[in-house]
Amino acid sequence: MEPVINFSNVTKEYPLYHHIGSGIKDLVFHPKRAFQLLKGRKYLAIEDISFTVAKGEAVALIGRNGAGKSTSLGLVAGVIKPTKGSVTTHGRVASMLELGGGFHPELTGRENIYLNATLLGLRRKEVQQRMERIIEFSELGEFIDEPIRVYSSGMLAKLGFSVISQVEPDILIIDEVLAVGDISFQAKCIKTIREFKKKGVTILFVSHNMSDVERICDRVVWIENHRLREIGSAERIIELYKQAMA
């Protein structure tokens, strides 16, 4: 079976502007010296990573902060492009990569539901049909008609996942944004993700909560120091990871 996510020999680099803040004078008065300092400096986010995800499979990316997990999700979601290698996906992708992503701070929660759901591929009529279910899932009550600039991080997470819960993706990508919600809402989100899995949705998931990873995922990709360290069954890789972190 052809994988629905193919992450092949992927490297992602970013320009690194060393001491750019303190170097403003040099940029103005000594531009040649400043550009020599800046030239060629790069930050390596991930290096030569490969993995595939089959249709209906749930895979977690784990690793320390800064290892390259979120970069990998952004590449699969198509938000960023690889420096080297290739990333291919097959089907509709729904992603929740950061709090407030796809939302406008001056619009109300209700208005942002229309905006975000449209970005995720729903037609306006479909959004209208699902609006009450989205609002009920969010547990935001009267705040749904307030501008989201007044929302807490937990409220933003609730709004974002509530929209996700009512779309019909082929691939679902979730970053560690659920960690900011309250415990009962987190449990509801995990239940929804597992329901997506039962429907055959492919899931790519980042979490530091190994219990959630064990409950949701078939396999785990362990990224360490920007490179692939291990890939295998959730049970085996989680045990290795816990031993390494002890």
Curated annotation (Swiss-Prot):
<feature type="domain" description="ABC transporter">
    <location>
        <begin position="22"/>
        <end position="246"/>
    </location>
</feature>
<keyword id="KW-0067">ATP-binding</keyword>
<keyword id="KW-0997">Cell inner membrane</keyword>
<protein>
    <recommendedName>
        <fullName>O-antigen export system ATP-binding protein RfbB</fullName>
    </recommendedName>
</protein>
<dbReference type="GO" id="GO:0005524">
    <property type="term" value="F:ATP binding"/>
</dbReference>
<comment type="similarity">
    <text>Belongs to the ABC transporter superfamily.</text>
</comment>
<dbReference type="Pfam" id="PF00005">
    <property type="entry name" value="ABC_tran"/>
</dbReference>
<dbReference type="InterPro" id="IPR017871">
    <property type="entry name" value="ABC_transporter-like_CS"/>
</dbReference>
<dbReference type="InterPro" id="IPR003593">
    <property type="entry name" value="AAA+_ATPase"/>
</dbReference>
<keyword id="KW-0547">Nucleotide-binding</keyword>
<dbReference type="GO" id="GO:0016887">
    <property type="term" value="F:ATP hydrolysis activity"/>
</dbReference>
<dbReference type="InterPro" id="IPR050683">
    <property type="entry name" value="Bact_Polysacc_Export_ATP-bd"/>
</dbReference>
<dbReference type="InterPro" id="IPR027417">
    <property type="entry name" value="P-loop_NTPase"/>
</dbReference>
<dbReference type="GO" id="GO:0140359">
    <property type="term" value="F:ABC-type transporter activity"/>
</dbReference>
<dbReference type="InterPro" id="IPR003439">
    <property type="entry name" value="ABC_transporter-like_ATP-bd"/>
</dbReference>
<keyword id="KW-0762">Sugar transport</keyword>
<dbReference type="InterPro" id="IPR015860">
    <property type="entry name" value="ABC_transpr_TagH-like"/>
</dbReference>
<dbReference type="GO" id="GO:0005886">
    <property type="term" value="C:plasma membrane"/>
</dbReference>
<keyword id="KW-1003">Cell membrane</keyword>
<keyword id="KW-0813">Transport</keyword>
<comment type="function">
    <text>May form an ATP-driven O-antigen export apparatus, in association with RfbA.</text>
</comment>
<feature type="binding site">
    <location>
        <begin position="63"/>
        <end position="70"/>
    </location>
    <ligand>
        <name>ATP</name>
    </ligand>
</feature>
<dbReference type="GO" id="GO:0015774">
    <property type="term" value="P:polysaccharide transport"/>
</dbReference>
<keyword id="KW-0472">Membrane</keyword>
<keyword id="KW-0625">Polysaccharide transport</keyword>
